[in-house]
């Protein structure tokens, strides 16, 4: 199994302006990383009337238990006025 550099990955993830419902490519990016680690992946899009679709990434490794489930999010809080930042928040 390839080695994962967590700090490098965190820096790469932070660069995505993934403000819901726009994922800015972060789902495909993470899906590619997980596939390289041997995960089977699927991006599922949830649609609800009067709302923009939201994507979720489902990844599975192995076949037998015991099982571990991680639920998290890839979106960020809107940065507000970019002129108020001394550096690009992404």
Regions found by a protein language model. Name each.
Residues 19-65, 88-90:
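A non-catalytic alpha/beta surface segment that caps or lines the substrate-entry region
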Residues 3-4, 9, 47, 64-67, ...:
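Homeobox/homeodomain signature
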Residues 67-90:
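Active-site metal-coordination/substrate-binding segment of hydrolases
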Residues 1-23, 35-38, 80:
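N-terminal hydrophobic or amphipathic helices/low-complexity stretches enriched
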């Amino acid at each position: 199994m390839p080695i994962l550099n967590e700090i490098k990955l965190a820096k790469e993830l932070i660069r995505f302006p993934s403000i819901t419902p726009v994922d800015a490519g972060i789902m495909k990016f993470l899906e590619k990383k997980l596939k390289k680690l041997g995960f089977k992946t699927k991006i599922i899009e949830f649609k609800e009337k009067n709302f923009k679709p939201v994507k979720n990434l489902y990844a599975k490794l192995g076949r037998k238990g015991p099982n571990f489930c991680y639920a998290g999010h890839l979106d960020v809080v809107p940065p507000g006025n970019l002129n108020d930042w001394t550096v690009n928040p992404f």
